[in-house]
Swiss-Prot record:
Lineage: Eukaryota, Viridiplantae, Streptophyta, Embryophyta, Tracheophyta
One GO CC term, this protein: chloroplast thylakoid membrane
SUPFAM superfamilies linked: PsbZ-like
Family membership: Belongs to the PsbZ family.
Protein name: Photosystem II reaction center protein Z
UniProt entry keywords in alphabetical sequence: Chloroplast, Membrane, Photosynthesis, Photosystem II, Plastid, Reaction center, Thylakoid, Transmembrane, Transmembrane helix
PANTHER family named in the record: PHOTOSYSTEM II REACTION CENTER PROTEIN Z (PTHR34971:SF2)
Quaternary structure, from the entry: PSII is composed of 1 copy each of membrane proteins PsbA, PsbB, PsbC, PsbD, PsbE, PsbF, PsbH, PsbI, PsbJ, PsbK, PsbL, PsbM, PsbT, PsbY, PsbZ, Psb30/Ycf12, at least 3 peripheral proteins of the oxygen-evolving complex and a large number of cofactors. It forms dimeric complexes.
Domain of life: Eukaryota
Keyword DNA damage tagged: no
Length: 62
């Protein structure tokens, strides 16, 4: 259970770093937003889901 918690925490830290780099690149590229909108929304949604997963796993571990 602790390994799942550690992986979820690592992913919830890694995804925002990827989004911080990826979103400005998408917005700066020509025709980038219309073609990559789903990828940006998927990354943001997965980060929100990981925040809830970390909270649930934290309550199970403690």
């Amino acid at each position: 259970m602790t390994i799942a918690f550690q992986l979820a925490v690592f992913a919830s830290i890694a995804i925002p770093f990827i989004l911080v780099i990826g979103v400005p690149v998408v917005l700066a590229s020509p025709d980038g937003w219309s073609s990559s909108r789903n990828v940006v929304f998927s990354g943001a949604s997965s980060w929100i889901g990981l925040v809830f997963l970390v909270g649930i796993l934290n309550s199970l571990i403690s």
